[in-house]
């Protein structure tokens, strides 16, 4: 069981970065009726490798879909009704250091699996590394409770298994097969996992050293395994549009990485060359242009690399109270900021799902005037109200004394089937009207429940959320907003929706030349670099090329569109950004943007902008337009590309100043 849950956890922890590089999923089943059809290989039709196609190729066909979905439903129910209650109790009794120590010890005991797996694939050096790790961690790590092999000596685990060994022998993986709590999704890999258990000492220890309490050691240790897995499960699987496909594709991707020993090899590459081998040199940021009307910020110590690489730094923007040292997230004693955010719902219209939002009240110690401040947070395209960036912004506002409401972005699938009333977004003026109606409903809900009183409302949104802020300003100007607003702040908004879509499409375009083998090679090479950087934030930028960063950024921004179309229409879609614009957005709305409401933005003193001079979603005319339209109501950062400066103190201070939460 330990190996089961540990592998499951690893697969789910990888999911965030796998999404970013292109392993995503669509809603394959709506209303209980499957709509999935066999897919044509991308390489066969010379199309671009969309996020959906990458996920399909890695996970493969699902010939036993009915059986597999039933097995997944069994696992999902067990996680909800058995595992979750047990986990809450366990994590509230044992502190996180104890749970992690036990996890390390169990991992150390599984040395025979990794040793045999690497030896059978002819990787003698890997087998020797595993032997050294076992010896060091057993002696110096007090039976494996700690990991000095990695932390002191730079000896890394291969995470090898017999599933990967069978793959290197050329054994086909066979049909997709999902079994409850078996962290493999193909016949070959499930067989390898079962044989792994024969090499696991815990399989036999129960026979020789009974616990005396009616259950074996493996079962007694199961809650500890669960504690390490359930948070990633809830964050990456339960929150997806189709949890079954999310699970199947994430586990298939993790299995592929383990087969190639990808993370192990990259960690050794980093150890051999701490500065990495492909990181581009630091570039000189743009200098303040002559005659600039807006404010100007140079970010101390930012070290810009390349625009797409710098954009990935938005991953550094997360709540500061996000990793309680003593207690796991499931514990009643956990102090993470996310536990302070109440997830609420509000009815929008009959026949549609209630729309969700997050709410965190102002601190009790806030001044009376500050406690009246209520700030709505609208994340970027596809963003969720409980995403790391939305919560980080809410924490920033909360710590400044305000209450905060986090919303799903209107291009999010949950929002589309609730607050957007089942209408695909893209007609920005109409989308903004439905957004304002949702915001009015939220204000009424909070007032009705005594959570806010006579609130002074502000709004902050970034990327596509920033563009929606601009259209809320037009509604205010036309007297259609429905509530009084104090300040509206748009961060890194694209000026021209059509130009932004074209830029994203151009970033994905080079993938048309990739064969299937080249795509898999890129996936195995780039994903470990993102995974490792996501954990250690090495030098603040991931160790990937600008070309790969462009594809990563574009795949992430575009991944939400197939989900939207599938959820709303009930038919599986792999729509590209350009096809979405031409196929689902009315002709009259395709060229809307900030320039079409220039007079409103120029004359509305409530609206301000924060932007970067090197944002690839702007061209030279866009930058001139913003500077001339907003004047001293715009702040320019010298670097950061598209939202890649959010983690810096300079940006955080400017947000609070523009929202009038601190003095400028």
Positions of predicted regions on the chain:
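N-terminal targeting leaders of membrane proteins
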Residues: 22-122, 214-284, 664
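N-terminal cap/lid segment of alpha/beta-hydrolase-fold proteins
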Residues: 294-370
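Alpha/beta-hydrolase active-site loop
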Residues: 424-449
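Alpha/beta-hydrolase-fold enzymes
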Residues: 471-567
